[in-house]
């Protein structure tokens, strides 16, 4: 008996990510420095941890409602209203999820059907496509490499018209992984002017919204496209809480009434103690990202200076904590091969650009969510490698 042939056929479209393949290829290199992680190197603020401890001591160990604690939804509502001028009712327009990843899964499985198309500016975070594929839908990438990784209204409308009636949604992630680019209010208004002409969902992955470096606050498309937008956010990046798995969905009540169905049968509810910690994070800790941002800016600028001097082309990222650098001419443009050789010779790991789709080939992504000491040593070894290659 061979039951493997009876698995969901959509799984055949899903492969182990190139990130994991690359990690496995270099995993046995002793003492390797990793600038690969998509999570803060900072620890969760002490006052947030104390709130979780209090919840445990008070025996807050039972299920919450499917939507999450009302106190948390109120805190989240106040937070996004103050920070981003978003207006979502805590009673019926906010869902608490197990990380932004579950928020995305619940959203995409709720809105997509077999044969649907989803537009995605590329290069892009590789986690969207497997979810889309599992429901029998298809990602259609929009190449942004010739425009500084920024989606323009013209590019967007052209892609919308090409897909026709099968187009169900657009995913827009900003500040973006892997490029670190973000959008100004004017750029978003121009995109919104296109999007509101079409009956499609706009899924906004804004999990890096607290990590912007322009001096201006993050602008959410939810302020412009309330009747179309589903906003995904979370506390992993803003409060260094990746392991707590706490995400949020903000959407109109008519949307959440449907989204809660997929959320409920995926997970029932988010972790209760983590929810109590999140209340503290979004109230007393609403500015906890500020010290991290100062460190990230210093690290970003140091890396850009060093890599630019070595011939890498870099569009300065205005958010998140990634550098997406084009491999200089004259070197191996196969990002996997280039970085595998670099790792083997100098014991430093970045992520191949090809891990972020075909439009990422020829680039490397490195995370500056690492100590300055680690970054300086990595840049020193990179300089040696480029000189010797």
Which residue ranges define each predicted feature?
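A short acidic, glycine-rich active-site loop
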Residues: 59-63
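Conserved N-terminal alpha-helix of the aminotransferase class I/II PLP-enzyme fold
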Residues: 64-98
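PLP-dependent class I/II
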Residues: 1-7, 12-15, 20, 25-29, ...
